[in-house]
Regions:
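A beta-rich soluble binding module of mature secreted/lumenal proteins
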Residues: 2-193
Length: 193
């Protein structure tokens, strides 16, 4: 009986180790952001200088709110650290076309500017510009319609050739990957930028 209980104890310990190891692996397989890639702190205003317009290509949820959305810079004051971008939301999937104006100013850190939307009735919020290559892509977690939206935005010239490092940073920092731009659904949208 003593040999049997020792074998059972060993088997139990072995199974416990295997089960624990499997539990540790579950978050990696669940689609959650991994936050493993290294990147410098984004300087949002340096990025604003380069990115005068962009289109959302990937979103972290499937609710369709960023489908075919384009942003266009209307104003940038590098000295005062203020910017204004207009979000152009086309009529799509039962959504009425609308424009939202994002007013941005310097925030607590270079990657986290403070913003208000339209007349500012919803108060100040903070955006998190997670990654940019300072050429043609931005990964940003930004307030949109009373919730956070983690997305990959690219310039018009990169829509059909999104740099892999940008996709990698999006996948590393946002929970899911949902395409929100395709030529058929978003026909004519790029004409606005």
């Amino acid at each position: 009986m003593g040999v049997f209980s020792g074998s059972m104890r060993s088997l139990f310990c072995f199974l416990l180790v295997i089960f624990s190891a499997l539990l540790l692996e579950v978050p990696l397989a669940s689609g959650k952001a991994k936050h493993q890639l290294k990147h410098d702190v984004t300087d949002a205003f340096k990025m604003f200088e380069v990115v005068t317009s962009a289109v959302a290509v990937l979103d972290a949820d499937g609710d369709g709110d960023l489908d075919c959305v384009v942003v266009v810079r209307e104003h940038l004051d590098e000295n005062k650290k203020t910017a204004r971008y207009v979000w152009l939301l086309p009529s799509l999937n039962g959504r009425q076309a609308e424009n939202l104006t994002y007013h941005l100013k310097e925030g607590p850190t270079p990657d986290k500017p403070v913003l208000t939307v339209d007349d500012g009735a919803d108060g100040e919020k903070t955006a998190n510009f997670i990654y940019t290559n300072y050429k043609n892509c931005v990964v940003v977690d930004i307030p949109f319609k009373k919730k956070r939206s983690c997305g990959l935005w690219v310039t018009k010239d990169a829509v059909h050739s999104v740099p892999q490092e940008c996709v990698d940073q999006f996948e590393d920092n946002c929970d899911m990957e949902v395409a929100v731009f395709d030529d058929e659904t978003c026909k004519g949208v790029l004409d606005n930028i």
